[in-house]
């Protein structure tokens, strides 16, 4: 109750620093600073105060778009004989490659298309009682790997690929993986912004005690959460969602400052 009364007495400007903590950031603060709770004299939405020092959670969240797409399509064909299966497969591959080209996906400057080796397997179906072979089937399959910087084209083509089924082509597409080529630079920038946010929070809190924030004493860099937009899911090990083109990245940093 003493803590609540003390916080209630804070002016609006200081409380706004605390209140603006997003749910995802607060959840991450609990994960990254949970070990401090037992020793803290005050712990409210990501900060604690002990004698001559203050520990706060700085956070930074931004939205960005992926610029790399990785996608694969497996093409299969069945036949009663090895040759029959392979010939059907060649026709299916031709239709699939033409479909991809029609949708703007072919090997070029901003895209790479790789054809994996074709494999042929024999499958035998046996009678459950006599164990006699009652059917022999050959399956030929081959994977097409696609790496592209045109992420929206990949997303659109993925949604249409099953149209090939209407042409008798057995395709098994994977879900596209969307990533970001400049993530290393983005992480450095996010940490800098999280550190700046930590100092702003520390100064707002210290002001109410008639104190000033001094030098940096300790930094606890947390994990990054890269999620679908507006997600509240967090992981203590960090996360990297690759299912969507648009993403949110959140960095959390526990920072201890000296208090004068």
What are these regions (language model features)?
Residues 2-260:
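Short, charge-dense linear interaction motifs
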């Amino acid at each position: 109750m003493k803590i609540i009364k003390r916080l209630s007495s804070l002016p609006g400007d200081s409380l706004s620093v605390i209140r603006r903590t997003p749910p995802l950031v607060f959840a991450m603060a609990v994960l990254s600073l949970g070990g401090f709770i037992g020793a803290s004299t005050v712990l409210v939405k990501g900060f604690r105060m002990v004698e001559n020092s203050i520990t706060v959670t700085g956070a930074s969240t931004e939205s960005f778009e992926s610029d790399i797409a990785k996608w694969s399509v497996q093409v299969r064909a069945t036949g009663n004989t090895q040759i029959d299966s392979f010939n059907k497969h060649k026709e299916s591959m031709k239709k699939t490659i033409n479909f991809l080209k029609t949708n703007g996906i072919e090997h070029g400057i901003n895209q790479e298309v790789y054809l994996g080796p074709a494999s042929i397997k024999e499958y035998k179906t046996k009678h459950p009682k006599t164990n006699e072979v009652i059917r022999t089937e050959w399956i030929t399959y081959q994977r097409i790997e696609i790496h592209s910087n045109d992420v929206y084209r990949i997303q659109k083509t993925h949604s249409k690929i099953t149209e090939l089924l209407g042409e008798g082509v057995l395709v098994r597409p994977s879900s596209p993986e969307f990533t970001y080529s400049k993530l290393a630079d983005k992480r450095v920038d996010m940490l800098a912004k999280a550190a700046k946010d930590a100092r702003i929070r520390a100064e707002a809190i210290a002001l109410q005690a008639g104190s000033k924030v001094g030098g940096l004493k300790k930094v606890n860099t947390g994990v990054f959460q890269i999620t679908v937009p507006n997600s509240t899911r967090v992981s203590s090990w960090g996360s990297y969602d690759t299912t969507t083109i648009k993403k949110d990245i959140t960095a959390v940093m526990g920072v201890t400052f000296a208090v004068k």
